[in-house]
Structure formats: C-alpha cells, structure tokens
Amino acid sequence: MPTFYTCTRVDASPGSTVGACSKEDSYKTIAKAINRVHKEVPEVVTVIENMANAKSNLVGTTFYDLKEIIALVEDKNRVRICLDTCHLFAAGYDIRTRDTYRETMRKFDEEVGNGYLAGVHLNDSKAELGGCKDLHENIGL
C-alpha cells in the first residue's frame, strides 16, 4: 500500500454490494479496509462520503449504514463523514428548507453523531427528492 506522505485525510465512498453479499457483510468489509489503512498509514483519517441511491445495492446511502460502518472501525477517532448534499437529497433526506435541513441534521446527530461530521460536499441536484439519482447540479440552477 502506498504511503500518503502529505495526506492526512482520505475520502472514500463505501461502494456497492453488487448483489454479492448482504449490507451487513459489506459493513464488515468496508470497516476491515479502513482498519487496514489506519494500521498502515498511522496519520490518516478516513472520511466516508454518503452515497445517493437508497433503493439499490449501494452502501452508505442511509445514516444507519454510516453508523454501522463506524461501529466496526477500531479507531473511531480516525473516521469521519462527509455529507454530499446531492446524495442526501437523492436518498430522500429533505434539505430544501431551513426546517427540513435542521430535521435531517438532527437525524444525523441522533443516528451517527455530529462529532463525526468532517465536511459537506455542497451542491444541488437535478433529480427529485428521493429519486435515487446521483445527478449533481450547480447550486441554485
């Protein structure tokens, strides 16, 4: 495995089960990979980005998925979450108004914990709420 000499954070998308295993098994596989990276590159923090399609084999589309992956990571101080706003919207998390955004973030805090939030990939969506499509749009268009 290459050493990330100047990199202190690595952003990773959880990926898909491709129908080959259960989501529960994929949580274990993802956490195992994160644990390996942490052992081999001691200074790196892994940042998991949420995924878009909650109706598929994708892992990381729900706050529950993210929570389950984190639960299996050995060093929880070295794992964080980046929320992609298009992916949130595609997965059915409504963030269109101040109130719905606050409710979504309350759910995130309740299920995952705000302490794990490292960043936000801020963008808009070309698709409808819960449309399960990863179609990024410029903000406001």
Regions found by a protein language model. Name each.
Residues 39-42, 68-78, 87, 91-98, ...:
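Short helix-capping and hinge/turn segments at secondary-structure transitions, especially at repeat
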